[in-house]
Amino acid sequence: MSDLPDTDFTQRFIFDDRDIRGEWVALDDSYAAVLARHAYPQPVATLLGELMAATSLLVGALKFDGLLILQARSAGPIPLLMVECSGERDIRGMARYEADQIAADATLAQLMPDGHLTLTIDPVKGQRYQGTVELDGKNLSECFTNYFVQSQQLNTRFWLNAEGGKARGLLLQQLPVDRQRDEEEREDSWQHVIALANTLKPQEWAEANETLLHRLYHEDAVRLFDIQPLRFKCSCSRERSGNALVSLGEQDAKQLVEECGGKVEIDCQFCNERYFFDASDVAQLFAGGGTDTASETRH
C-alpha cells in the first residue's frame, strides 16, 4: 500500500467478514492552524486536538448536511472546549482556560472536574438534536465511548491522540446483524478488533493510516473507502460581527462605540480575527448599507 499524501482527512473502512466498521481521522494542518492562533498550554492543546479528532470522526460517521458542535464544559481550570465541523468538513476549535491553574501533568478530572459533554447536530434540513452526558472517563477517548454506550445500542469505541502537533483518532462500531448472526461469534469479533486497536503505541499514531491499519488488521479482510478531506475554516465575518451590533439596537450600538473611545472591537474566539466598527460604520449598518468590507480587520 502507498502512503497517502493528504494531511487532513477522514477515511471509512469496513471488515468484510465481520459486522464492524471503522473511521480514521488525521489532522495536521487544521490542528496546526488552530494552535497557531492561540498560545494554549500543552494540556489544553492536547485536549482540544483530541476533541477535534472526535468531532471529525462523528462527522465522517454520521454523514449529514449541517453543523456538528461538541462542547466540553466544567467549573475547573478549563471551563470550555468547543469544536465545530460542517458537513463540508470545515473545522474550527477553541478553548477557555485559567493559565495559572494548568499543571503540565494534570489529568482530565483535574482540568475539567464535574464536566459535561454536549453534542449538537444542527442540520440544514430537519430537527436540531442535542444530547448531554457527564465527562465520565479518565480521558476523552473513554468519555466518548461512554457517551455512545448511553445513547446507542451498538457497541462503539474511540481512540484519540494529539501529540507533536498532530491529532489522530480511530472509531470502531459494531453494525446491526448481517454477516454474523451468532451472538457469541459477534462478541468474539468485536473483542478481536478492540484488542488489536488497544495495542496502538503513542509513537505509531503519526504513521500513515494505511500503514497503521495494515499493521493492526493485516489478517482481516479490511476494505478502505475514499478519503474525505478536512480543512480549517472559520465562519466568522465582518458581516456577522455587524449583525451582532445591529441586534443590540441602534441606540445601544452607538453608545457602545462611544464607551469604547470611538471604535468598538469584536473578536472571534476561534480564529482571533478582530473586527472594528466606528461611528460611521454603525450609522451605515442602521441605514441599511451593510458592512464595508474595506474597513479594518486584524488577526
UniProtKB/Swiss-Prot annotation:
One of its GO terms (biological process) is protein refolding. Redox regulated molecular chaperone. Protects both thermally unfolding and oxidatively damaged proteins from irreversible aggregation. Plays an important role in the bacterial defense system toward oxidative stress. It comes from the Bacteria. Keywords: Chaperone, Cytoplasm, Disulfide bond, Redox-active center, Zinc. The lineage of its organism: Bacteria, Pseudomonadati, Pseudomonadota, Gammaproteobacteria, Pseudomonadales. Under oxidizing conditions two disulfide bonds are formed involving the reactive cysteines. Under reducing conditions zinc is bound to the reactive cysteines and the protein is inactive. HAMAP family: HslO. NCBIfam families: PRK00114.1 (NF001033). Belongs to the HSP33 family. The keyword Disulfide bond applies. Disulfide bonds join C234-C236, C268-C271. One of its GO terms (molecular function) is protein folding chaperone. This is 33 kDa chaperonin. GO terms for cellular component: cytoplasm. It comes from Pseudomonas putida (strain W619). It is found in: Cytoplasm.
